[in-house]
């Protein structure tokens, strides 16, 4: 789990919080706020982990928002917090990679107008990330295990399906009559 900041068109800073499962690179929870606090983080963790699941560890940095209250909540839910070293983002490389991909693939192209707009952009990007974006570490699969559809016939043509407002595309087959 981690935070990253996003400036709006009015230069207001918004904070995006996310929890990522390392195995399939799946975003378990994501939300946006203007003023992150430890109480807000605990609420987000309640939403990310509503019940005991297959997860054992949570990797987090030394951000002041991940204080005693957050650590206590994690331990109470059966999750073991693992803090990274000071100024060592490579120790949470999967989360940092997701932040970089999110910035390169959507946030560097679209300026968020406000908190609701950023929340929608992030929600749409997470959907794209789970269903369409392939990952080398997953052997060119998606976190949701995308089905590969073979060409149905020799007359089928490739069609482009825009994603994220046309910034990215997914391709499929269409039968020609």
Task: Describe every region a protein language model picked out.
Residues 1-177:
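Charged DNA-binding/catalytic regions of mobile-element recombinases
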């Amino acid at each position: 789990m981690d935070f990253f900041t996003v400036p709006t068109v009015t230069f207001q800073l918004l904070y995006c919080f996310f929890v990522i499962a390392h195995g399939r690179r799946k975003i378990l929870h994501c939300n946006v706020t203007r003023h992150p606090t430890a109480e807000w983080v605990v609420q987000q963790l309640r939403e990310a982990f509503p019940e005991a699941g297959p997860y054992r560890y949570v990797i987090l940095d030394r951000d002041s928002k991940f204080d005693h209250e957050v650590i206590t909540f994690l331990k109470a839910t059966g999750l073991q917090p693992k803090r990274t070293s000071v100024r060592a983002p490579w120790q949470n490389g999967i989360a940092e990679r997701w932040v970089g991909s999110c910035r390169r693939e959507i946030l560097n192209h679209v300026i968020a107008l406000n908190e609701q707009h950023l929340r929608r952009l992030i929600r749409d990007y997470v959907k794209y990330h789970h269903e369409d974006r392939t990952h080398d570490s997953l052997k060119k699969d998606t976190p949701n295990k995308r089905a590969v559809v073979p060409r149905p016939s020799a007359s089928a043509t490739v069609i482009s399906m825009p994603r994220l407002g046309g910034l990215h595309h997914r391709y499929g087959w269409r039968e020609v009559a």
